[in-house]
A protein has these predicted regions:
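Fe(II)/2-oxoglutarate oxygenase catalytic core
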Residues: 1-174, 180-206
Length: 206
């Protein structure tokens, strides 16, 4: 199929989403003010939300990785290494919360340690996988809240032609998109929007 900047999967097993949501409730007490990529600081004019971090050693990491690979095979065909930082962001957006227009990655690279594919675990000195500069290539967001349980909070994208479009709000929808795509989370008007968010790194663009 032709390359699309976003890839959506809306038919993930609902029973798995329910199990996932129940299992990660233990991370609710770890929620803290969300920071902004780049300067690693709280910037309420840019982003207002709370999040905790779930290590990819958790079974959810491998489960999501399976679908990331599926999206990559079917659409992107990028060279990928692993989930950035070995963690997945578990995010809560309460009434009044938002994330303004931003991108998750560009052509700039950052040093990453050697990591074991699909786990986020650092490799031992006697193992080799990759080392050095990496770039964020794909971003993903898994909708955990029923659309009827909150108003606002839409994930909105804008393409190179200036056209805007929204991701599906259906619970259990996995959205995978090119990290260079401009997007935002619109202000939540009521209720609570929960999601799992992460980024996938690979070698520098060629």
């Amino acid at each position: 199929m032709a390359f699309l900047t976003t890839w959506n999967m809306t038919d993930l097993p609902s029973e798995m989403i329910d199990i996932l949501e129940e299992d990660i409730k233990k991370f609710d007490n770890w929620q803290d003010k969300s920071k902004v990529m780049g300067n690693d600081e709280i910037a309420p004019k840019i982003r207002n939300s709370k999040n905790a971090w779930i290590p990819t050693e958790h079974w959810i990491g491998g489960w999501i990785w399976y679908y990331i690979q599926k999206a990559n095979r079917e659409n992107f065909l990028y060279d990928l290494y692993d989930i950035d930082g070995g963690n997945i962001q578990y995010t809560h957006y309460y009434p009044g919360d938002y994330y303004t227009w931003h991108i998750d990655g560009d052509i700039s690279t950052n040093f990453k340690p050697e990591i074991k594919p699909g786990t986020g675990e650092n490799l031992r000195d006697d193992q080799t996988f990759h080392k050095g500069e990496c770039v964020r290539k794909l971003s993903f967001s898994l909708q955990l809240s029923d659309a009827k349980d909150y108003r606002g909070g839409e994930v909105e994208f804008i393409n190179s032609a200036g056209e805007r479009y929204f991701a599906p709000k259906q619970k259990g929808t996995l959205i995978v998109f090119d990290s260079r795509t401009k997007h935002r989370v619109r202000t939540v008007k009521s209720g609570l929007r929960k999601s799992l968010v992460g980024w996938v790194v690979g070698p520098r663009w060629r």
